Amino acid sequence: MQKFAPNKQISAFLLSNLIFFFYLCNNQTYQIMNSNLKSFCIFIIYMLGAIACFAFFQFCYPYHLYYQEQNQLFLASWDYLTTYLEKPGWLACMAGDFLTQFYLYRFMGATILTLCILLAGHNIKCAVRKADIKGTWLPNLAAFVVMTLLVCFSFDYDYRLSSILAIAGGASVFCISTTILVSTRKLINKIEKMDENNPTLHRMGLPIWISTFSITISIFVCHWFFGYGVWIYGALVFIGNLMNIMKAGTYYCLTALVITFFLLMLCKRLYFCDFQTIYTYPGIGKLVKPQLDQERTLAVDCEYYFGNYNRVINMVEKDK
């Protein structure tokens, strides 16, 4: 009996390890399946939201989009394009006005608007992840809240597509600047590892100065390209620094953020506009409910413009 005892111990040991191995495999498989299920559910939510947005603006609100196309001019001439430089956010305004011209075609208006809102939500989600905000649902929740607000803003006939692109642009500037900043810090760490006994760059505070310089430059660039989208960039920088408040140089970054936002007031002489326009152009938007009564008025106006006089008569008689 003593001869076979070690074999029994070895068998028990192998069996316990085999059970533990299967447990790990099943646990990893469950985690992967759970992660895939979450991603699939999030994708379904985005798709349903996009379909609902497209369907509403295409079938219930199309004349608001036609009205914007009729009242928004875009000319492919150098003299006209240079006029965009007279206000902040020239890139967002130029792209938004260009895309608005396609609202004239059927299904194009609702499609462009929905895609731009999805683009803004995607950029917000990526930017929130870059800001070191923990949690799987928080980036998607932030994106969903922003997209919902943009849909509500779009109920207003005066809300321009460029305002949506300004938000998307502000988030994209944060993503790009953060990626460049992280790459620069990694390069500094590699340089210092070559000379571990003499970490000169960190003693000089070079990473901190690079961060503050990056924030200052990014704010001016974001404001020039995307106007009030700079508020999105500033909010993401502020939240990102709060999440890492105990790290060295955080207070310097927050100070640079506040000072640079005040320095934007100097652009008043550059653009010849008031302070409100400097910080809110091309337009923040306001929460309004669907203006269905105004939609009927715009429907009559647009159909008359298109030459559909019989349809105009039917609309007017139907409202009586």
Regions found by a protein language model. Name each.
Residues 39, 114-132, 148, 171-179:
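Transmembrane-helix motifs of polytopic, lipid-linked glycan transferases
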Residues 36, 132-133, 185-206, 238-239:
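Membrane-interfacial, low-structure loops and terminal tails that flank and connect transmembrane helices
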Residues 28-53, 252-258:
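Start-transfer (signal-anchor) and selected internal transmembrane alpha helices
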Residues 42-65, 222, 260-269:
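Transmembrane signal-anchor helices characteristic of membrane glycosylation enzymes that use polyprenol
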Residues 56-115, 296:
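Membrane-interface coil-to-helix junctions
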Residues 42-55, 139-148, 211-217:
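Alpha-helical transmembrane segments
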Residues 272-320:
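Soluble catalytic regions of membrane-associated enzymes that act on cell-envelope
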Residues 67-70, 85, 89, 113, ...:
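Membrane-interface micro-motifs in multi-pass membrane enzymes
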